[in-house]
């Protein structure tokens, strides 16, 4: 019974190593970690200057 457990553990260890990969792990670039990306892709409002139109009450609506 212990030989089958040892064999199973050996293969599980090999599978785990393959999933992790060998060598040094490098940081993957993501847009959230780069502020220059956020500056370049920021949405710029190109509408009418000023704020939104004033709110109307129910009595002012047509």
From Swiss-Prot:
Ranges where the record places region Disordered: 1-62
Organism: Dictyostelium discoideum
Composition bias type Basic and acidic residues, residue spans: 7-29
Polar residues bias spans: 32-43
Recorded superkingdom: Eukaryota
Stated name of the protein: Uncharacterized protein DDB_G0268226
